[in-house]
């Protein structure tokens, strides 16, 4: 998080300190059992805090969703159902969902903490230094991401929001895919469709045409992410671009080719088949993961 300039004090961080005795019987299912330490992120309708459980000392991320009380009963039920699905995921490259509960009319989600950094920060670092990420480094992280998505898809769970900011990297170089599957519950259609707040560079053509999201939409986003790791910018990025021109570029798959002198034919080909306007022609995650495993083994030993 950026530091506050001296002399400029931000709003005080809300405190959710226990007002009453601990509830050991409730485990991770009440705010009374957590000490909130600091805010580490915020979305349009949610805030994420670093916290620690007062029962076992485990550091966690606590996501508080304010829009929950604006949802109708069906949306709430669907959301809780989705979180229950996410709790069943168990993979070293997927952020673990520990618990969720409603308290003070807010939805609280307790997650594994991954605060060492994320892929967007790494991309910015290389861009600032005017250096490309070495291909073997690209595969080192990408193969872990594919492993995470393979686990999710095998359990019929879509991610729905794959982008560099949702790919966390621990201090030991382990990838953790986070912010799983819940974006559609905590967004406003009007905001997503008509504003450039959080420009949707990774939006697939079928989403532009409102044909619904499917597993192949995750593959499109995965291809965009692989491209961005190599080019240090989104395939459809452009200066002074409005939403209409962005959508046109996406529909036409109009993006600059990756430099062939820096990146292998295999990497460039994988990007091309993932960023295909026709979802049916995109590979499934098993295929992408196989290529990533082969290329990781090949580049790691060279």
Swiss-Prot record:
PANTHER family: MITOGEN-ACTIVATED PROTEIN KINASE KINASE KINASE 20-RELATED, SERINE_THREONINE-PROTEIN KINASE NEK7
Record PTM: Phosphorylation at Ser-195 required for its activation.
Function: Protein kinase which plays an important role in mitotic cell cycle progression. Required for microtubule nucleation activity of the centrosome, robust mitotic spindle formation and cytokinesis. Phosphorylates EML4 at 'Ser-146', promoting its dissociation from microtubules during mitosis which is required for efficient chromosome congression. Phosphorylates RPS6KB1. Acts as an essential activator of the NLRP3 inflammasome assembly independently of its kinase activity.
Taxonomic classification: Eukaryota, Metazoa, Chordata, Craniata, Vertebrata
Segments of this protein annotated with the region NTE motif: 20-33
Chain positions with Phosphoserine modification: 195
Active site: 161 (proton acceptor)
The enzyme's E.C. designation: 2.7.11.34
Chain segments annotated as coiled-coil in the UniProt record: none
Record Pfam families: Pkinase
Assigned keywords, A-Z: Acetylation, ATP-binding, Cytoplasm, Cytoskeleton, Kinase, Magnesium, Metal-binding, Nucleotide-binding, Nucleus, Phosphoprotein, Serine/threonine-protein kinase, Transferase
Known cofactor(s): Mg(2+)
Record field: catalytic activity: L-seryl-[protein] + ATP = O-phospho-L-seryl-[protein] + ADP + H(+); L-threonyl-[protein] + ATP = O-phospho-L-threonyl-[protein] + ADP + H(+)
Activity regulation field: Binding to NEK9 stimulates its activity by releasing the autoinhibitory function of Tyr-97.
Domain comment as written in the entry: Displays an autoinhibited conformation: Tyr-97 side chain points into the active site, interacts with the activation loop, and blocks the alphaC helix. The autoinhibitory conformation is released upon binding with NEK9. The NTE (N-terminal extension) motif is a structural component of the catalytic domain and thus contributes to activity.
Organism, as annotated: Rattus norvegicus
Subcellular location: Nucleus; Cytoplasm; Cytoplasm, Cytoskeleton, Spindle pole; Cytoplasm, Cytoskeleton, Microtubule organizing center, Centrosome
UniProt xrefs under InterPro entries: Kinase-like_dom_sf, Prot_kinase_dom, Protein_kinase_ATP_BS, Ser-Thr/Tyr_kinase_cat_dom, Ser/Thr_kinase_AS
Major localization class: nucleus
Signal peptide residue numbers: none
SUPFAM superfamilies: Protein kinase-like (PK-like)
Gene Ontology cellular component annotations, sorted alphabetically: centrosome; cytoplasm; microtubule organizing center; nucleus; spindle pole
Molecular function per GO: ATP binding; metal ion binding; molecular function activator activity; protein serine kinase activity; protein serine/threonine kinase activity
Name of this chain's protein: Serine/threonine-protein kinase Nek7
Family: Belongs to the protein kinase superfamily. NEK Ser/Thr protein kinase family. NIMA subfamily.
Modified residues (N-acetylmethionine): 1
Presence of keyword Transmembrane: no
């Amino acid at each position: 998080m950026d530091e506050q300039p001296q002399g400029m004090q931000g709003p005080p961080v809300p405190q959710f300190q226990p007002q009453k005795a601990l509830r050991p019987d409730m485990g991770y299912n009440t705010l009374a059992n957590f000490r909130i330490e600091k805010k580490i992120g915020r979305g349009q309708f949610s805030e994420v805090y670093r916290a620690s459980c007062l029962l076992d000392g485990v550091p966690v991320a606590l996501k508080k969703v304010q829009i929950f009380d604006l949802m109708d009963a069906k949306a709430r039920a669907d959301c809780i159902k989705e979180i229950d699905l996410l709790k069943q995921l168990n993979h070293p490259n997927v952020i673990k969902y520990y618990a969720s509960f409603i308290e003070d009319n807010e939805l609280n989600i307790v997650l594994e903490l991954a605060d060492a950094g994320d892929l967007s920060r790494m991309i910015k670092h290389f861009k600032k230094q005017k250096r490309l990420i070495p291909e073997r480094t690209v595969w080192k992280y990408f193969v872990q991401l594919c492993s995470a998505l393979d686990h999710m898809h095998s359990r019929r769970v879509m991610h729905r929001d794959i982008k560099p900011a949702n790919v966390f990297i621990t201090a030991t170089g382990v990838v953790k895919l986070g912010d799983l599957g819940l974006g559609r519950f905590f967004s406003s259609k009007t905001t997503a469709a008509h504003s450039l707040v959080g420009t949707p560079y990774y939006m697939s053509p079928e989403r532009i045409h409102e044909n619904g999201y499917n597993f192949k939409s995750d593959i499109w986003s995965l291809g965009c992410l692989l491209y961005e790791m190599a080019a240090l910018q989104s395939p459809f990025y452009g200066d002074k671009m409005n939403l209409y021109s962005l959508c046109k570029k996406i529909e036409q798959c109009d993006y600059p080719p990756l430099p062939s002198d820096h990146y292998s034919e295999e990497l460039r080909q994988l990007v091309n088949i993932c960023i295909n306007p026709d979802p049916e022609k995109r590979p499934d995650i098993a295929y992408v993961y196989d290529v990533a495993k082969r290329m990781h083994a090949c580049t790691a030993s060279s």
